[in-house]
Amino acid sequence: DWACHANDAAASIHDVLEMSNAVQAAVDFYNAHPNETLILVTADHETGGMAIGYKTTNYDTFLTNLAHQKMSYAKFDSTYVQGYIANKTPFETAMQDVKNVFGLTLPTDPAAASAGKLLLTDYEVENLRKAYERTLQVGSSSQSKMSQQDYELYGTYIPFSMAVCHTINHKSGMDHTT
C-alpha cells in the first residue's frame, strides 16, 4: 500500500510477489484440508495508479531496470536520506549511493559507458539535483512547510527519494497516475 502511494514500482512489485507467495501457502493448506478451509483475499483500495508504458521509452518497458533497486524508498529514506539531511551531504556523494541502491548512474561516473538504460540524462540529473537541494532545505518537514509545487512534484514525501523513484520508474517504462 505505502509503496504504491509513494510510486515505488519495484517495492510494489515485490509486495505483489510476496502476496502471491502468501496466497499460494493458503492454497497449499486448503489442498491438504479442503473441508475445513476457506480462503478469503481482499483489499481495501488500489493506490498509486501504476501504469505500464511511458512516453520517454516509446511506451516500451524495461522492467529489468527495476531489478537494480535494492531497497524501497522508505528504507532508502531511513538508511541514507536522513543522514544526508543531517550532514548536508554533497549531491555527488548522495548520487554514489543512488547508483549503488538503484543503479542510476551520472554521466560523469567512470562506469557511465556500461550503465545502459540507467545512465541519467542531463535533464534527469537536473531534476534530481533540484529535488536533492529541496530535500536539504525542507528535510522531512510536514507538508505545511512545502510549496504547492513541491506537493505536485513529490506529494507528502521527501523530494529526493520521490525524484529517484520517479526516475527509475520512467526509465523502466512505468508511471503512476498519482
Task: List where the protein language model places each region.
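A post-motif C-terminal structural segment
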Residues: 1-178
